[in-house]
A protein has these predicted regions:
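One-carbon transfer enzymes
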Residues: 1-147
Length: 147
């Protein structure tokens, strides 16, 4: 993947998954969670000592958890979004690094939202990785300053 090391970790068992993450990422600078759909334990986060970025397929704090496109569609949103944030032990609650949005209309169906959202997720994650790896993010309380 463009020369970037990639490791797949199953999310079947949280304890086993977290052990695999530690084993496979000993030399990494940043851990990226994409479609992991699990909350990392506070023990893991306190010992990992490196940035952990999660990409969520909604404009947080709206539509946390699973199936945000379905939630957004059922609410008739006018904007669809993606959020890259630091992972915490609380679901989709970490400090937000980057967000991207795009307008949608009543003509868009769930598949349209997913397609547009996937594009936003890629842009959002790339910008977040770039900002974090270039040390351009400062965390203060549960907020970030990105410069």
């Amino acid at each position: 993947w463009y020369g970037v090391p990639f490791h797949y970790v199953s999310s079947e068992s949280k304890h086993v998954s977290e052990e695999q993450i530690i084993e496979k990422t000993q030399s990494t600078d940043i851990l990226i969670m994409a479609r992991y759909m699990q909350i990392l334990s506070s023990d893991f986060l306190s010992t990992y000592n490196r940035p952990v970025i999660n990409i969520h397929h909604s404009f947080l704090p709206s539509f946390t958890g699973a199936k945000p496109y379905h939630q957004a569609f059922s609410r008739g949103v006018k904007l669809i979004g993606a959020t890259a944030h630091y992972a915490t032990e609380a679901l989709d609650e970490g400090p937000i690094i980057i967000q991207k949005v795009s307008p949608v209309t009543h003509r868009d169906n769930i598949n349209d939202l997913k397609q547009l959202g996937t594009h936003l997720e890629k842009q959002c994650l790339l910008d977040a990785i770039r900002a974090v790896s270039e040390h351009r993010v400062i965390i203060h309380d549960n907020k970030t300053i990105v410069f």
